Regions:
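N-terminal capping/small domains of soluble enzymes
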Residues: 1-102, 113
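Glycine-rich phosphate/ribose-binding loops and adjacent secondary-structure elements
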Residues: 105-198
């Protein structure tokens, strides 16, 4: 992935000391990262790397990765030569096997599909919050979809963020920068009276 094991664990510990949470990212849950933070956000992306319900049940929040600012509208590709034994274990792959993420969820397409999955998350966890991560592109339409799917929170990923899997042309030129995107998102949430969504 984009971050080393040591970096992910250090960020988890630092976030805990700061009183905030940490997110698994699309690559799956590193056990030591989760164990060192009491506010762990578990993310499921289109590749569903390493997904299991027992991992969801160890988390304090869960969200769908519907988009990413650095590579909006695309999937991901971690070349096989970067898939070490540890990455393979976390992602449910074989060492050396490329990690390919499709551009969208093959089995979740409608808001009702996501809502059903979200209900299962809440049922299995005693009601942890379920959210959506979206790229800052079609902000209002994506918020409408997330709200219809029953999101408790929305993560808005603006232009300028980075990831090892993002082409420079997308990372540097596509999407709305985060601060203006937040203003648009807040205005739209107020307009549709989605006060329950953070």
């Amino acid at each position: 992935g984009a971050l080393s094991r040591e970096a992910k664990i250090a960020l988890s510990k630092g976030s805990e000391l700061a009183g905030t949470g940490i997110c698994s990212g699309e690559g799956g849950m590193l056990p030591e990262e989760q164990e060192n933070n009491s506010r762990y956000f578990y993310e499921i992306a289109t590749g569903k790397f390493g997904f299991s319900w027992d991992k969801v049940e160890k988390s304090q929040a869960f969200h769908f990765k519907g988009g990413q600012g650095a590579k909006t509208g695309t999937g991901g590709h971690l070349p096989g030569d970067k898939v070490t034994q540890e990455i393979a274990d976390v992602r449910g792959l074989k060492p050396g096997q490329p990690a390919i993420s499709p551009s969208s969820f093959p089995d979740l397409t409608t808001a009702a599909d996501f809502s059903k999955f979200a209900d299962e998350v809440r049922s299995r966890t005693g009601g942890i919050p379920v959210g959506f991560k979206i790229a800052a592109s079609h902000i209002e339409a994506d918020i409408d979809f997330a709200v219809e799917a029953g999101a408790d929170y929305i993560i808005l990923d603006g232009r300028g963020g980075g990831t090892g899997a993002a082409p420079n042309i997308l990372r540097d030129n596509i999407n709305v920068p985060t601060i203006p995107a937040l203003a648009r998102a807040r205005r739209h949430l107020d307009k549709i009276e989605a006060k329950h969504v953070s």
